[in-house]
Amino acid sequence: MPDFLSITLSGVPPSLTSGETSNLKWQWVDEGVLMLTPHGACSQSVVLSAGIHGNETAPIEILNQLVSDLLASQLPLAVRLLVILGNPPAIRAGERYLTADINRMFGGRYKNHSLTDEARRAEILEQKVGEFFASDPLSLRLHYDLHTAIRGSHHNRFGLLPYRTTPYCAAMLRWLKDSELDALVMHTSAGGTFAHFSSEFCQAASCTLELGKALPFGQNQLEQFRPITAGLRALVSGGQLPTRSTEAMIFYRVVKSLLKQHADFKLWVADDTVNFTRYPQGTLMIEQLNEHYCVEHEYEWILFPNPRVALGLRAGIMLVQMDENDLLQA
């Protein structure tokens, strides 16, 4: 099979939509969706996705290289694997999205949007992921959705765990640690993200990974992603990662979503504020009609501050630090 990313960017399906190598069988499932299956038995079903936001190119390049190495038999395959490039039109355009953010549409929320290509794409991805996991109901289900952040961060590599009412998968948490993430954030309410969909509707152990900053194709310094790249290669090949050698991962949970509900909304942070900036108790964070929010805990940290979002969307989230053991008792 030719280069996965090149075919996806061309907008033309490959002339051959299935095939096999000495190690695996592959199938072109849909535009930007490729399934790889090892010849032997396996106990894990893994979904790896990137490009849900089209301008977040580093994860796309990482997954494309992973697929190339698997197809060239330079890396063995030990899991059932579905690789997804989420929003091909936006990837071609180099834009975050064309009409609306797909990563707010999952869990059926695409039905609340007009019939755009991106709403249809969210529906297709839900269908393909659901079918993939359902075809092997006894396997361990994992989904990592790879992104890069719009702005800088005190933690360059961090993960976001979707809200769930049962404990998080210990094997997933161990992999996240050994892949040397700097921080992990636990959501405390349901959302429309791809990772939340696979967790809630497919019972997968899921996590959104934020890796560095969004840059155009060819400008990424992929060496800075070496730990997560090594983690992904070990995950799909059945290899073992060395025990974490960097500082311990820091854990956070969401305590407040800053929703922009009125035209007079004001987010009281500087335009150059980076993710995980800390604020002391009493600091005024937002003001709008009939609402203001001040930091309620001794310290809170802000994530994804963006006052320019449309009305009704989240302009940031506030976090507090938490103990790792709470994740296993969620």
Curated annotation (Swiss-Prot):
Reaction(s) the record says it catalyses: N-succinyl-L-glutamate + H2O = L-glutamate + succinate
EC number: 3.5.1.96
Cofactor field: Zn(2+)
Cofactor note: Binds 1 zinc ion per subunit.
Binding site for Zn(2+): 53, 56, 147
Pfam families, per database record: AstE_AspA_cat, AstE_AspA_hybrid
Protein name per its UniProtKB record: Succinylglutamate desuccinylase
